[in-house]
Design a protein with these regions (language model features):
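NAD(P)-dependent short-chain dehydrogenase/reductase
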Residues: 9, 129-130, 153-208, 213-222, ...
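Short alpha-helical oligomerization interface
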Residues: 82-99, 133-140
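Active-site helix of classical SDR
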Residues: 147-150
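C-terminal substrate-binding subdomain of Rossmann-fold SDR/epimerase-dehydratase oxidoreductases
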Residues: 192, 196, 200-314
């Protein structure tokens, strides 16, 4: 299979590129710049290549799709996260919505029928329950979630009008080696391994579904590989939601002497924005339809992440 990965130098995109290349697929990575991991990948695998381009520039997107005519596109390119989207709302809409429109239009023009779009639990806004499935109402509040839900709806229009197959993986707080964003559990693991003190004033009661990168990649590729779908949206997550206080306790247990603490109350991002109510994502649909079976519950994922950080590869 020939797969074009937009935003393929990013955290999830690069992990997908490594996995697909290793199993023998032809992988084309499209991004602003080649990351060290993608440079190493293209040097190691003849079936992996890189093209520089801007997702918001129609000529760039059209050129790569027309040249390579992929069997499928995994659309990762985006401004990711609540904090980044609040820092640049218009850039977020331009990249996330405008970029996705460029991808969809190039698919229409050049005969590419299949796309897997990396979406997010932020499309839901505040959760109505501790565990939610894909039928939960979409009421996004921040530019990130708003833009990603807009992409899902835009894709539905292209599906109806042009017969494309557009599938959406709603991810949730993906973590593991390579995570670039200063967010838990990265900040906690980094501090623990470095022997630094990190006391958070609040957030101890906050629960969210943390998904280890290997499980995330497995779920996305299962969506990619399945020929016929009854649904266009899947949760790719762990299906559980430990509290931040519980995560702190696990890390302290795994790294003796770690000086970590999370006080009670809401979780705040690095810019001070309070996170809305979260919880776990019900992954029954992905289990049933895709055979998805995450291998990294939070304790195992944290242990793997700590080991990678100690080895200097995180």
């Amino acid at each position: 299979m020939r797969v074009l990965i937009t935003g393929g130098s990013g955290f999830v995109g690069a992990a997908l590129a490594r996995h697909l290349s290793a199993r023998g697929d032809e992988v084309v990575v499209f991004d602003l710049a080649m990351s060290p991991s993608i440079a190493a990948l293209t040097a190691r695998h003849r079936n992996a290549s890189f093209l520089a381009g801007e997702i918001t520039e129609w000529p760039h997107v059209a050129a790569v799709v027309q040249k390579h005519k992929p069997d499928a596109i995994i659309h990762c390119a985006a401004v990711v996260g609540v904090t980044a989207s609040l820092a640049g709302p218009m850039a977020t809409f331009r990249v996330n919505i405008g970029g996705a429109h460029n991808v969809l239009e190039s698919m229409r023009l050049f005969g590419v029928k299949r796309m897997v779009h990396l979406s997010t639990e932020e499309t839901y806004g505040p959760f109505d329950a501790d565990v939610i499935d894909e039928t939960h109402p979409n009421r996004p509040l921040k530019p990130y979630g708003i833009s990603k839900y807009a992409v899902e709806r835009l894709a539905c229009d292209y599906v109806a009008a042009y017969g494309l197959v557009c599938l959406h993986a709603r991810l949730c707080w993906v973590y593991g080696p390579g995570l670039p964003r200063p967010r838990v559990p990265k900040t906690l693991v980094d501090a623990a391994v470095a022997g630094k003190r990190l006391h958070l004033d609040g957030g101890g009661d906050f629960r969210v579904d943390h998904t280890y990168i290997d499980d995330c990649v497995d779920g996305i590729i299962r969506i990619l590989d399945k020929k016929d779908h009854r649904f266009d949206v899947y949760h790719v997550a762990s299906g559980e939601a430990a509290s931040l206080a519980e995560i702190v306790a696990m890390i302290r247990e795994m790294v003796p002497g770690a000086d970590l603490k999370a006080g009670p109350g809401p979780y705040r991002f690095v810019d001070g924005t309070a996170a809305v109510r979260k919880g776990a994502l019900d992954i029954s649909r992905a289990r049933r339809e895709l055979g998805y079976a995450p291998q990294y519950p939070i304790r195992k994922g944290l242990a793997a992440y700590i080991a990678a950080t100690r080895a200097g590869i995180a």
